[in-house]
Amino acid sequence: MRDQAPLIHPTAVIDPAARLASDVRVGAFSLIGADVEIGAGTEVGPHCSIHGPTRIGSNNRFIGHAAIGGEPQDKKYAGERTELVIGNGNVIREFVTINRGTGGGGGITVVGDDNWMLAYTHVAHDCHVGNHCVFSNNTTLAGHVTVGDYVIISGFAGAHQFCRIGAHAFLGMGALTNGDVPPFTMVGSDSLGRPRGINSEGLKRRGFDAERISAIKRAYRTLYVAGLPLAEAKLQLAEQARDSDDVRGLLEFIEAAERPLLR
């Protein structure tokens, strides 16, 4: 939308109960329902629908045809009040869908700050997405998935319900995971979702020095290459964690698992 264009296109439909900051822009044929709150500097492109209860922060961009805050796609949902919360600085591309939570799943779907969600991404009910993530085209998160910060998910990849994807992980194109993906881990580009080393390039880009990356590589080899039972691998990781906050975070992620760890 150009600077000289009207802030609210005359074909947009905005419920009187919606609360929009004074500089929010809304494009042609978009619908914003009741109990929607949108912060300053946010742009809603054409043909978007935003349903409440939904809270959206500042400086977000919904490019067009996005469906935000719709009812969860869960047969157990019975109309209870649930919500979607989106942070600041996110870019939501064409035909992205993000659903509200469910009463049985915590009641809230959360998207953090500075994420990029490319065309046809789907974020299901009760998902919790961190900050600085990139979801490529057709990324699919089933219900209750948790995604850490700086995660990159390639096109046509997805995660089974209740899975966790740790910070700085990378899922290759078409990767499907039905288990927890530890932080820093790369998942191969196939439907089996096999681990394929650590995300070294991504870590370098984010300022991890050689010493930190070396400690993470050692932890990965302990977990995936040494052939150890998980219980024994965790004991060795506990020793390594004494000298590395990154390994300590990796071990804490493993200890908190409720689903099987991807191995």
Swiss-Prot record:
It catalyses: a (3R)-hydroxyacyl-[ACP] + UDP-N-acetyl-alpha-D-glucosamine = a UDP-3-O-[(3R)-3-hydroxyacyl]-N-acetyl-alpha-D-glucosamine + holo-[ACP]. Its EC number is 2.3.1.129. Pfam families: Acetyltransf_11, Hexapep. It is found in: Cytoplasm. The lineage of its organism: Bacteria, Pseudomonadati, Pseudomonadota, Gammaproteobacteria, Lysobacterales. One of its GO terms (biological process) is lipid A biosynthetic process. It comes from Xanthomonas campestris pv. campestris (strain ATCC 33913 / DSM 3586 / NCPPB 528 / LMG 568 / P 25). Belongs to the transferase hexapeptide repeat family. LpxA subfamily. This is Acyl-[acyl-carrier-protein]--UDP-N-acetylglucosamine O-acyltransferase. CDD domains: LbH_UDP-GlcNAc_AT. Involved in the biosynthesis of lipid A, a phosphorylated glycolipid that anchors the lipopolysaccharide to the outer membrane of the cell. GO terms for molecular function: acyl-[acyl-carrier-protein]-UDP-N-acetylglucosamine O-acyltransferase activity. It comes from the Bacteria.
